[in-house]
């Protein structure tokens, strides 16, 4: 829970977290090492100095550390697990639904557990999706269109098999389709993350919500032109948000474009933990104000009401979460109340970097 200087409580749903295993023992080949090296480079480049982790910790931090960083030291109230299997790179997978389910079982009121599918798995994959949905009562999935599988280096949501999987997801009540459409990660191919196929899928599947993780970066314009027309396309701010202290002008450009084209009702906060931790991200976001010239040019408004929507209300709507009821469920395990922190300035956050 984030509490403003005036005492107002803001319910926070972190829309993008992981609990991965990238240890040497789990790396199947050089590509597993390349992948986590790239993640660590993003972490090192955009994190404040006092938030930098050792490489050993970064490779596998574990569930206890995750809980501490999100809900005790951090302001998150709930978090959504977004799995990334990468079975061609990691022996037991990088960050799987099955791994995440262990922590979900331990803290059922804290986590939303999403699944995943890969249309290249054919009929067997459809059966597996049925089983996964039944076991975990899924409301969402995370897709990684650039994931390698054998000789294939990606797929598109407009592929015939992908459409069969989306049809099955809708039939199963899996309404929220999170898709990585953002920066590439070595060794994956940049163009396999192209955002264009979102346009086709969103048009063809009006009963589904497509949450474009990372807002299509570096293809921000392409994403905005699609999302402003497709009523069922949303933007996830993971990766975009950490630029807030390293390159605030760039972040101001990104968030103003998103607000101008999509509005505050279609944007979701995500820390992308464990690349970054939520405490400094939320503090910086709450302290951030759009530069006057950008606000005037775009007409974008990033006031407290907009921030509340982005930080939790929008995700709650997509996942059918009654926030007041959820607060009551969480009350027994709430940590010592956090001190009001909205008076933290961006300069103070930047000074730690």
Regions picked out by a protein language model, each given a short descriptive name:
Residues 23-29, 93-94, 126-128, 153-155, ...:
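Short aromatic-enriched loop/helix-cap "lid" or pocket-rim segments at secondary-structure transitions
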Residues 61-68, 96-101, 125-129, 195-198, ...:
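Alpha-helical scaffolding within the catalytic cores
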Residues 78-80, 85-192:
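Active-site gating/metal-coordination segments in enzymes
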């Amino acid at each position: 829970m984030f509490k403003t200087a005036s005492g107002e409580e803001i319910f926070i749903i972190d829309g993008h977290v992981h609990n991965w295993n990238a240890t040497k023992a789990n790396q199947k080949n050089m590509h597993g090492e390349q992948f986590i090296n790239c993640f660590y480079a993003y972490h090192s480049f955009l994190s404040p100095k006092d938030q930098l982790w050792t490489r050993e910790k970064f490779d596998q931090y574990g569930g206890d550390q995750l809980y501490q960083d999100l809900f005790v030291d951090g302001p998150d109230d709930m978090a959504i697990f977004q799995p990334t299997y990468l079975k061609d790179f990691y022996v037991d997978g990088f960050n799987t639904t099955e791994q995440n389910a262990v922590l979900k079982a331990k803290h059922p009121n804290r986590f939303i557990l999403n699944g995943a599918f890969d249309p290249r798995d054919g009929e067997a994959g459809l059966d597996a999706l049925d089983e996964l949905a039944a076991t975990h009562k899924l409301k969402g999935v995370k897709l990684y269109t650039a994931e390698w599988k054998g000789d294939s280096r990606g797929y598109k949501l407009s592929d015939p098999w992908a459409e069969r999987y989306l049809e099955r997801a809708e039939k199963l009540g899996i309404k929220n389709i999170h898709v990585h459409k953002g920066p590439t990660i070595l060794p994956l191919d940049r163009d396999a993350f192209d955002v264009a196929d979102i346009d086709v899928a969103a048009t063809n599947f009006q009963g589904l919500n497509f949450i474009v993780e990372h807002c299509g970066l570096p293809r921000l314009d392409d994403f905005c032109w699609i999302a402003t027309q497709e009523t069922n396309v949303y933007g996830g701010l993971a990766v975009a948000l950490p630029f807030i202290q390293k390159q605030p002008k760039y972040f101001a450009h990104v968030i103003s474009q998103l607000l101008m084209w999509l509005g505050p009702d279609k944007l979701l906060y995500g820390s992308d933990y464990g690349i970054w931790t939520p405490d400094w991200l939320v503090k910086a976001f709450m302290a951030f104000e759009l530069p006057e010239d950008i606000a005037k040019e775009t007409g974008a408004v990033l006031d407290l009401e907009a921030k509340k929507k982005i930080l939790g209300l929008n995700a709650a709507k997509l996942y059918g979460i009654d926030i007041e009821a959820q607060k009551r469920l969480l009350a027994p395990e709430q940590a010592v109340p956090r001190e009001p922190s909205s008076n933290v300035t961006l300069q103070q956050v930047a000074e730690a970097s």
